């Protein structure tokens, strides 16, 4: 059964993942990544542009499909070897501001989970956000 997830990551880091065809969540932890299975979908929510920056973004910034079966490690720099998963990202998309998503009836249920960095959402919620992100969507005409 296909499941749908949100990962909370700065936009700067999301863009690295999109460019490289991978995802990382929760500062490279393995457990959250292994909750996802091949064929699951991931939406990235970016509270800020940069991890240590002050400028807020508060938007959904990428959407993709998990391609592999398990998390693997990659050394990004000496002493930091995070886990990641391979992802096929849907492109092009536009950022979807949180204000658009707050209209969805399930938003209140998910809003409090953002602080956990990675959590499952319903297919209906996922599709609602995804539709807002697609450039060719009637929602964006």
Curated annotation (Swiss-Prot):
Disulfide bond annotation, renumbered to this chain: none
Pfam families: EVE
Species of the source: Streptococcus sanguinis (strain SK36)
Entries under InterPro entries matching the protein: EVE_domain, PUA-like_sf, UPF0310
Protein name: UPF0310 protein SSA_0254
Residues spanning the signal sequence: none
Sequence similarity: Belongs to the UPF0310 family.
């Amino acid at each position: 059964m296909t499941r749908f997830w949100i990962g909370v990551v700065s936009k700067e880091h999301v863009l690295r993942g999109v460019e490289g065809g991978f995802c990382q969540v929760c500062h490279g932890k393995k457990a959250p990544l292994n909750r996802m299975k091949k064929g699951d979908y991931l939406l990235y929510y970016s509270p800020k542009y940069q991890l240590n920056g002050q400028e807020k973004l508060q938007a959904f910034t990428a959407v993709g499909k998990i391609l592999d079966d398990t998390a693997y490690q990659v050394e990004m720099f000496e002493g930091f070897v995070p886990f990641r998963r391979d992802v096929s990202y849907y492109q092009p998309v536009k950022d979807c501001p949180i204000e658009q998503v707050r209209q969805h009836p399930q938003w209140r249920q998910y809003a409090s989970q953002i602080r956990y960095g990675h959590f499952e959402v319903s297919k209906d919620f996922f599709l609602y956000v995804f539709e807002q992100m697609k450039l060719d969507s009637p929602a964006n005409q």
